Amino acid sequence: MTDGGREGSGQDRRGRPGNPADVRLPGGLTLRALIPNAITASALAFGLTGIRFAITAAGGHSGVPTSGLPLDDWQKAVLAVILAGVLDGIDGRIARLLKAQSRFGAELDSLADSISFGVAPALILFLWSLQNLPRLGWFASLAFALCCVLRLARFNARIDLADQPHKSAGFLTGVPAPVGAGLAFLPLYLWIATGREEFREPVLVGLWLALIAFLMISNIATTSWTSIRPRRSVRLELLVILAIVGAALLTEPWLTLVGICLFYLAGVPYGVWSYAKVKRQRAARAAAAAGPPPAEA
């Protein structure tokens, strides 16, 4: 996410009021710059609120939540992080739409992501399950939070590099932080959906959290949704599928989230295979451009 690099005076050359988004607020900040940063700050607030709900849930009853409304505190904790992910997905796009990118917005976004998708899921899962295995459980939570922060630091360090093989081919490096947070909650989704205490087993949750942490900092190529270009012949079918998924999220949200997680995990090997195919094609084109080796005298 990036924010307002171009600040306007709020007036055109003739002194008349210009774009309302360019009106300068007290302190020199423009409304254009404020909007995407406010969305990022809201995402951070949602992530922190998820921790608050988890603390409340851990201090009260620990039974399986009932279905429907009102939501249980464990459900609210997960939902808060998911909403943070939704806001994280739109703040950068809004910044680009408003032409409000800057270094400040990028740094704010990374700091917010490290808390909302690193610290918050780690603490929520620790309070829900891993505290029953105090030492190893805490190490698993710690590893997840640290790997999320390291992934974001790696992304920031590479952002200005010209040579990014994964990015230039339309792929990501490792699992993105918001997706990693959503995947980390898979045992919690299953517990809410089925009521089976086996999914709350701290050893199982700890191993799962360690696996997702590894995927976040790994160098494997993962599919970038923004680079997917469906063929015209299947676009209507894709719209129908998306509509069905949306309806399923409203009627059976937890089972639908389980399905989305499994679908994404099934696509990880496909991303690795697709990138390997792209690498082979690039190597073949480079070899063809270089021409045959010179003949020996």
Task: Give residue spans per PLM region.
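Alpha-helical transmembrane segments of polytopic integral membrane proteins
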Residues: 48-51, 83, 87, 121, ...
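Hydrophobic alpha-helical transmembrane segments of polytopic
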Residues: 39-42, 77-81, 140-143, 147, ...
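C-terminal ends of transmembrane helices
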Residues: 92-103, 149-167, 217-226, 272-273
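C-terminal membrane-associated helical module and adjoining short loops/tails
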Residues: 1-25, 169-297
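Acidic (Asp/Glu-rich) catalytic motifs at the cytosolic membrane interface
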Residues: 67, 79-123, 153-159
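Short, amphipathic, aromatic/basic-enriched membrane-interface segments that mark the entry/exit
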Residues: 31-36, 104-112, 171-173, 224-234
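Helix-coil boundary and interhelical linker segments in multi-pass alpha-helical membrane proteins
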Residues: 49-79, 121-142, 185-204, 251-255
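Topogenic membrane-insertion module of multi-pass membrane proteins
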Residues: 1-89, 271, 297
